[in-house]
Amino acid sequence: MKSYIAKPEEVQRKWYVVDAEGKPLGRVASQVALILRGKNKPTYTPHVDTGDYVVIINAEKVVLTGKKLDQKMLRHHSLYPGGLKEVPYKEALAKKPEFVFEEAVRRMLPKGPLGRKMLKKLKVYRGSEHNNEAQNPEVLELRY
């Protein structure tokens, strides 16, 4: 018996909506990353994008446990000497919670062209309103 290998044109994609209000950032991000990769499907193939679309709402109401809100830093480098930029998560969540969510999920996806393609299926919104109602997204209850 041969192993099944999914073809990109055969993949059936669904839309899911996840409410992040009051849930830990890492737990939501890890489950969303699995859905974006397609690991929740029996047709999962590592080198093919078999994942579904995910809409995250209420990104500004996400929770960071412990002292992470004050102590954890969001870092990036300008590629100039001494160009390390650090912003506390408290400020980053206040200014742009969408970016914080996208970064958390991006770091859990594969690096390279396939991971970038998977990340394009993630839509993050600050409040409870989103403009993807036409796709009839299913409400996804997170496991943990």
Swiss-Prot record:
Keywords: Ribonucleoprotein, Ribosomal protein. GO terms for molecular function: mRNA binding; structural constituent of ribosome. CDD domains: Ribosomal_L13 (cd00392). Pfam families: Ribosomal_L13. GO terms for biological process: negative regulation of translation; translation. InterPro entries: Ribosomal_uL13, Ribosomal_uL13_bac-type, Ribosomal_uL13_CS, Ribosomal_uL13_sf. GO terms for cellular component: cytosolic large ribosomal subunit. Belongs to the universal ribosomal protein uL13 family. Part of the 50S ribosomal subunit. HAMAP family: Ribosomal_uL13. This protein is one of the early assembly proteins of the 50S ribosomal subunit, although it is not seen to bind rRNA by itself. It is important during the early stages of 50S assembly. This is Large ribosomal subunit protein uL13. The lineage of its organism: Bacteria, Bacillati, Bacillota, Clostridia, Eubacteriales. The gene is rplM.
